[in-house]
């Protein structure tokens, strides 16, 4: 499949895909994720259409906590919703992340991973913000470079819908978010072709609606609460296969070999580095260099 090439950074690539699958964006800017929300806001103001033929409604709140609340509420009424954040901003979203995951609401948080400030402010990239969210119930997908952000972000959106699980889609702050590369760009028709429309309709059918009312945010005692928490394990057990399914759809369209894990290096290697994020490009170059030297 031939795709057009454009020079862009990781933030732009993520925003390009997010806009396609989004009906509402709840935003609040924080470095280094701000350009994603900025692009979505600009495209919405210009009347750009998503794959559903509508313009994204952008709601800027007073804080990241407010943005997360907007995402939660918007999902509850059946609108496909996205947000963009990092660092302390992501930490402010954690209370709503528990609720979003617990209610099996499909959405994507695009995160340009950044250091969580402690004894001092640090705006540069690491995974401390992402790791703080591991037990929220969000699935996590990580990309290495801007091309991977473009290629794999649709996997997060589509797998979230089919797997009924919210995704934290992340890449390294500045190192990937602001790295400009000449990459191949998705056409929205191809993104629409991958979208599980039956899952979209099912999501909308379960939205809060006065014509078929349902209760949300109920109170449960320990006996029932535990059973319900255990019941969701089947959703998470099935999720890796769903992610792999959409990675294979991407591979079929692009001729790539994306998988849940990709091995790179000699088949008889005695030591293995397990890594994710922008470091992978460096590791591959080192492997090539050492292999060439024998």
Task: Name every feature range the model reports, one short phrase each.
Residues 123-173, 197:
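Conserved thiamine diphosphate
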Residues 52-56, 167-262:
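Conformationally flexible catalytic loops at phosphate/diphosphate-handling active centers
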Residues 114-115, 171-178, 277-279:
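Glycine-rich beta-alpha junction loops
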Residues 9-13, 248-271, 284, 288:
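Glycine-/acidic-rich phosphate or pyrophosphate-binding loops and their flanking alpha/beta elements
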Residues 275-283, 290:
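C-terminal substrate/ligand-recognition segments
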Residues 93, 119, 178-180, 282-284:
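Short helix/loop capping segments that flank catalytic or ligand/cofactor-binding pockets
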Residues 1-132, 137, 154, 173-174:
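Thiamine diphosphate
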Residues 42-46, 285-294:
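Short helix-loop-beta junction
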């Amino acid at each position: 499949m031939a795709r057009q090439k454009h020079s862009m950074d990781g933030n732009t690539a993520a925003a390009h895909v997010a806009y396609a699958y989004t009906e509402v964006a709840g935003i609040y800017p924080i470095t280094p994720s701000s350009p994603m929300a900025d692009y979505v806001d600009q495209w919405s103001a210009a009347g750009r259409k998503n794959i559903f033929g509508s313009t994204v409604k952008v709601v800027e709140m007073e804080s990241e906590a407010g943005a997360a609340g907007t995402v939660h509420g918007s999902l509850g009424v059946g609108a496909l919703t996205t947000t963009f954040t990092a660092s302390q901003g992501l930490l402010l979203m954690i209370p709503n992340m528990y609720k979003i995951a617990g209610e099996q609401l499909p959405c994507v948080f695009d995160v340009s991973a950044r250091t969580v400030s402690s004894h001092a402010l640090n705006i540069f990239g690491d995974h401390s913000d992402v790791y703080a969210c591991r037990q929220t119930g969000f699935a996590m997908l990580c990309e290495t470079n801007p091309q991977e952000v473009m290629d794999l972000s649709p996997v997060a959106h589509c797998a979230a819908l089919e797997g009924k699980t919210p995704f934290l889609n992340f890449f390294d702050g500045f190192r990937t978010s602001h790295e400009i590369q000449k990459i191949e760009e998705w056409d929205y028709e191809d993104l629409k072709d991958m979208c599980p429309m039956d899952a979209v309709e099912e999501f909308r059918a379960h939205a809060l609606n006065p014509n078929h009312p349902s209760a949300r945010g109920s109170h449960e005692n320990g006996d029932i609460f535990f059973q319900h928490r255990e019941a969701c394990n089947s959703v998470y057990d099935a999720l890796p296969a769903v992610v792999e399914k959409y990675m294979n759809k991407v591979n079929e369209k692009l001729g790539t070999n994306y998988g849940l894990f990709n091995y790179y290096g000699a088949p008889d290697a005695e030591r293995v580095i397990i890594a994710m994020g922008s470091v992978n490009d460096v590791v591959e170059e080192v492997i090539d260099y050492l292999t060439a030297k024998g």
